[in-house]
């Protein structure tokens, strides 16, 4: 049996791309979503895509004992709760202090049906691999897995460079399609992912040194569960 080290592929430290700069907007773009899923995504954006903060706020805003994923919660109740939250003073949770200027970023995308309801997840860790942020969002109601993987990387990088000034970054990711585009210099092979690819390049421009670790399917990825919740939100309908 191969060791964990043998089951990953690593690339040497990258250098800062020339001529790139800037990061994506606070509210990240998405594929087609139902009106309800769009409202949830807006709430997520208001709290910096912190999944727990968003779902807790939504659950508290829904009357009675219902919640975001409670089958007894009607679409009307959910819509009213989301609209009330967006009209309130929602804010990002306090930013955790990192240990040093090196970071680890786990990312993952999930698509049911490929294409189907898709979500993105990302976990930001510091040099000691203490968790700083658990992020998630819906990507689209009929999006492919590769699109979700690009969206996950964009999500994690956007929040990382918004909150911190990373000097070194290790991205842990299982998508070779994204790896070959971002670090291998290949053109995107998935139709329609160019905006995500360009946003990733722009975010990486602010990180002087970065590398990737390719995760095997058997390697643990804490971003997976967040991507799954994002896909659950993307499945909200109708529309």
Per-range role (PLM):
Residues 44, 106-113, 220-232, 236:
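Acidic, metal-ion-coordinating active-site neighborhood of RNase H-like domains
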Residues 94-147:
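RNase H-like nuclease fold core
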Residues 133-171:
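Acidic helix/loop or adjacent segment enriched in Glu/Asp that either coordinates divalent metal
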Residues 1-94, 132-135, 164-166, 229-239:
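Intrinsically disordered, low-complexity regions
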Residues 124, 192-195, 236-239:
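Compositionally biased, low-complexity linear motifs
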Residues 159-226, 233:
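RNase H catalytic domain
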């Amino acid at each position: 049996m191969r060791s964990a080290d043998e089951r990953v592929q690593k690339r040497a430290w990258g250098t800062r791309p020339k001529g790139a700069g800037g990061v994506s907007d606070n509210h990240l773009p998405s594929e087609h979503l139902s009106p309800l899923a769009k409202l949830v995504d807006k709430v997520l954006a208001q709290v910096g895509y912190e999944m727990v903060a968003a779902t807790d706020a939504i659950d508290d805003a829904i009357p009675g004992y219902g919640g975001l994923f409670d089958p007894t919660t009607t679409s009307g109740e959910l819509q009213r709760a989301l609209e009330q939250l967006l009209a309130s003073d929602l804010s990002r949770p306090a930013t955790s202090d990192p240990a040093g200027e090196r970071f680890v970023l786990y990312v993952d995308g999930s698509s049911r049906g490929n294409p189907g309801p898709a979500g993105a997840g990302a976990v930001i860790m510091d040099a000691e691999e203490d968790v700083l942020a658990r992020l998630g969002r819906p990507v689209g109601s009929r999006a492919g897995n590769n699109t979700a993987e690009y969206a996950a990387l964009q999500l994690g990088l956007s929040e990382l460079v918004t909150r911190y000034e990373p000097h070194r970054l290790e991205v842990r990711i299982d998508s070779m399609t994204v790896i070959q585009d971002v670090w291998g210099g290949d053109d995107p092979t998935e139709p329609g992912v160019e905006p995500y690819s360009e946003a990733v390049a722009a975010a990486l421009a602010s990180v002087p040194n970065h590398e990737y670790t390719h995760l095997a399917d058997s390697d643990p990825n804490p971003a997976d569960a967040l991507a799954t919740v994002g896909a659950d939100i993307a499945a909200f309908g109708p529309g």
